[in-house]
């Protein structure tokens, strides 16, 4: 069947993520430490990772909502250090905003915009991501006809939910959709299991 729709993963497919996330994480943590000095010692241990795991264990669906999860990690740690709920929520909101600002300081892989522009002339383009990047904020939304994230769907690839939403939005059958992504399980296996075609693309490997 002819390909009519091409969907893309975002992180590590259209841009490298690791260094950006590390820098964003450091900026948020530095802010919290400037407001509550005792948080610095906590953040230098595995406490943050432990809280992350505890929150997911309590509500497994939160793994799909990364912004909410990060906010609650900040809030939990701050309250454990004696901050009131109101104080913790205020600081957590500010820290999350700092993180998200840093998270969007991204540089596309070479040639990405040229490829998207060429593909848009022939195919319906979409985004299927497990992350929380905002393509409008990044200034690349004009290349895409639709975008679905794990936060929006409350589910993550390799579940079929993302791919079914693409079919629903475009009114196309799975075999007419080709998904491109860097992750062999989430992107390739997820797409194939949903009946779509898949291309594994990993600029870093």
Predicted regions and their residues:
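Asp-based, Mg2+/Mn2+-dependent phosphohydrolase catalytic module
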Residues: 1-6, 18-19, 34, 86-88, ...
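N-terminal helical cap/lid subdomain that shapes the substrate entry/recognition surface
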Residues: 2-110
């Amino acid at each position: 069947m002819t390909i009519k729709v091409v969907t893309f993963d975002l992180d590590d497919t259209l841009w490298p993520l690791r260094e950006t996330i590390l820098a964003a994480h450091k900026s948020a943590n530095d802010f919290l430490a400037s407001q509550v000095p005792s948080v610095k010692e906590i953040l230098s241990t595995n406490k943050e990772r432990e809280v992350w795991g505890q929150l997911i264990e309590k509500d497994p669906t939160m793994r799909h909502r990364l912004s909410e999860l990060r906010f609650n990690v900040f809030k939990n740690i701050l309250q454990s250090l004696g901050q009131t709920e109101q104080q913790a929520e205020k600081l957590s909101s500010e820290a999350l905003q700092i993180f998200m600002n840093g998270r969007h300081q991204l540089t596309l892989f070479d040639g990405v915009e040229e490829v998207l522009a060429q593909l848009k002339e022939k195919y319906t383009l979409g985004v299927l991501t497990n992350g929380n990047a905002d393509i409008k904020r990044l200034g690349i939304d004009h290349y895409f006809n639709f975008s679905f994230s794990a936060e929006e769907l409350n589910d993550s690839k390799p579940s079929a939910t993302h791919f079914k939403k693409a079919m629903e939005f475009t009114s196309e059958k799975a075999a007419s959709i080709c998904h491109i992504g860097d992750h062999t399980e989430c992107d390739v296996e997820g797409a194939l299991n949903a009946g779509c075609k898949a291309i594994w693309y990993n600029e870093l490997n």
